[in-house]
């Protein structure tokens, strides 16, 4: 099997290392950012490529930015050349959002995982933590589920936030300065009209990246939009057969936005702006995670 072959190669390499028989010609000096250098040897894998978690493309400059499973941001050309690690000094595990936005002669990369949201205006030389999200470093049940950016570059976050009694509820934060400072606009609890107090696993948000429109909110069998006044406006119920694992995605049709919602293992579709929904059947057996 592949595991047996891999273990065999590892054992051979280890023996060569300890006996001093490892060919020194196999070593080479590598210069990496922060002016660090050293002798590096390939340690594997033998037949497995690395994978990325999410990516964004700068079409104007023919660049692609990728978040690797190892926790780094990489930049290369669209031809697949010149790959450079921009954040080798900090490992950010579980990145689920990466987006380049440009404004006022600034190029800003936004990077998010479940624990933090970072931004850099200098291609990763320095990373800054967004302000207003201190709760993420508190109780372990706090986490950042979703980041979306509107066509006019307003940033919204969906998070799970502790209530102080070992429970958490979904909350939505908003930034009007391109991700530098966030303000809470909604707590998704019974005071906001929700049927119960639940974590962000029972919610998701979506908006069009390329067209001006609303922020849409999925909550189990309920579908809303967020108005310009940061208030919830109910649209319709969804005929779901379960709850939890809420995932919402969509696009812009010729007359209305269309949506696909994943709730409790089933997939639902709306082609008329969320006014009515049909059950499209059970999801595939397994899927990676939100960004896939």
Predicted regions and their residues:
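Extracellular glycan-interacting surfaces
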Residues: 1-292
């Amino acid at each position: 099997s592949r595991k047996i072959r891999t273990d065999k190669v590892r054992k051979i390499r280890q023996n060569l290392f300890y006996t001093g028989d490892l060919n020194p010609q196999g070593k080479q000096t590598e210069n990496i950012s922060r002016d660090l250098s050293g002798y590096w040897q390939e340690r594997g894998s033998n037949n497995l490529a690395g994978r990325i978690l999410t990516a964004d493309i700068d079409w104007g400059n023919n660049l692609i930015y990728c978040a690797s499973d190892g926790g780094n941001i990489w930049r290369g050309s669209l031809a697949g050349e010149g790959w450079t690690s921009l954040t080798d000094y900090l490992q950010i595990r579980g990145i689920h959002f990466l987006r380049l936005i440009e404004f006022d002669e600034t190029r800003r990369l936004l990077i998010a995982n479940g624990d933090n949201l970072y931004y850099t205006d200098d291609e990763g030389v320095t990373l800054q933590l967004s302000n207003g999200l201190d709760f993420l470093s508190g109780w372990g049940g706090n986490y950042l589920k979703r980041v979306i950016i509107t066509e006019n570059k307003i940033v919204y976050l969906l998070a799970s936030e502790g209530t102080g009694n070992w429970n958490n509820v979904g909350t939505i934060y908003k930034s009007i300065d391109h991700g530098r400072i966030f303000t809470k606009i909604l707590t998704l609890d019974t005071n906001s009209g929700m049927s119960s107090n639940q974590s962000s696993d029972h919610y998701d948000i979506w908006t069009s990246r390329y067209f001006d429109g609303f922020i849409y909110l999925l909550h189990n069998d309920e579908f809303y939009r967020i108005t310009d006044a940061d208030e919830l406006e109910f649209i319709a119920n969804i005929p779901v057969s379960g709850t939890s694992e809420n995932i919402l995605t969509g696009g812009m049709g010729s007359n209305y936005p269309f949506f696909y919602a994943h709730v409790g293992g089933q997939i639902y579709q709306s082609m008329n702006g969320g006014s009515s929904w049909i059950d499209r059947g059970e999801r595939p057996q397994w899927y990676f995670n939100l960004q896939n």
